[in-house]
């Protein structure tokens, strides 16, 4: 049994972490801190989650590490090199000495590094869908990826609005997640996020990137088959990342992945480009449950330990 602490336990990600940890029989939450109160002692914790904004994470991470805790940061403070963080987030990094030991917390790609880490930077919600979609396609696609993605309002840490209201708030390379997407996918990214104010959760990322000359020479269905095979091969027996196809009876959408720990992708080829549609729960796979997955890997446990009780872990 390990003892867990959560900074920012009353926020949406903090609440989602608590929702999952209730089902984890090898983890007990003994420390919680937010802007109004503190419960428990940090020094008694084995693992600490920072479900806080970037400035707070930079403050609390050194404290937690000094107390002997492993740290999983849910903000963007420990995902990028210092210069990229400061340029993308418009903040001065106040704990740059920790960046050299922070591991990017995407277990589908970096499980070995995470297993021996003292500190993990949990990926962002949009980057999770984009990176897992693009990274296996190196050498098969070229140029810059264009990404247009919708997210439920919980991605903006806000309550659902009663009336329909879709908000686009960034264009091109201005969003703070673009450097993260580019660094870990291996491709330049042009990104437009859209928040669906009347929807609570779910990311629907639509990615367009040019095919290599070799794949352009193939019939579209053959090129698409090779791309699907590359993604499926990259994740092998990983039950949490799947390539799916629409059928006459079912077209995949966010309702298939909300309240699951899955990321599913479908793709098509047209006029020399591949179009990938990646779907995930932004609070689950895009945040809290991936954080628990990181905790499990750091402890040497199964990635799904304790998560399968909180989420549907498969898709029909």
Predicted regions and their residues:
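Predominant activation on well-ordered alpha-helical scaffold segments within soluble catalytic domains
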Residues: 18, 131-138, 178-182, 228, ...
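NAD(P)-dependent Rossmann-like dehydrogenase/reductase catalytic/cofactor-binding core
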Residues: 264-316
């Amino acid at each position: 049994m390990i003892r867990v602490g959560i900074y920012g336990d009353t926020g949406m990600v903090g609440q989602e972490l608590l929702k999952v940890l209730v089902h984890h029989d090898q983890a007990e939450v003994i420390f919680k801190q937010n802007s109004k109160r503190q419960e428990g002692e940090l020094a008694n914790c084995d693992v600490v989650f920072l479900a806080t904004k970037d400035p707070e994470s930079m403050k609390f991470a050194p404290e937690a590490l000094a107390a002997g805790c492993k740290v999983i940061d849910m903000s963007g403070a420990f995902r990028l090199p210092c210069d990229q963080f400061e340029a993308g987030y418009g903040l001065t990094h106040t704990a740059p000495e920790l960046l050299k030991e922070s591991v990017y917390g995407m277990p589908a790609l970096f499980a070995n590094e995470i297993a021996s880490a003292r500190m993990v930077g949990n990926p962002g919600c949009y980057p999770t869908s984009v990176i897992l979609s693009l990274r296996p396609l190196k050498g098969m696609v070229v140029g810059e990826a264009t990404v247009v993605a919708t997210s439920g309002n919980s991605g903006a840490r806000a309550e659902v609005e009663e009336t329909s209201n879709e908000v686009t708030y960034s264009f091109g390379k201005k969003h703070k997640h673009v450097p993260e997407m580019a660094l870990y996918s291996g491709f330049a990214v042009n990104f437009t996020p859209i928040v669906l104010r009347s929807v609570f959760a779910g990311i629907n990322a639509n990615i367009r990137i040019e095919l290599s000359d070799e794949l352009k020479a193939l019939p579209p269905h053959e090129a698409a088959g090779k791309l699907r095979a590359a993604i499926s091969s990259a994740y092998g027996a990983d039950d949490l990342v799947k390539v799916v196809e629409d059928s006459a009876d079912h077209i995949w959408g966010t309702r298939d992945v909300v309240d699951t720990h899955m990321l599913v992708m479908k793709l098509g080829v047209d006029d020399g480009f591949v179009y990938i549609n990646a779907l995930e729960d932004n609070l689950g796979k895009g945040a809290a449950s991936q954080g628990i997955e990181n905790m499990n890997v750091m402890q040497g446990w199964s990635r799904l330990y304790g998560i399968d009780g909180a989420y549907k872990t498969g898709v029909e």
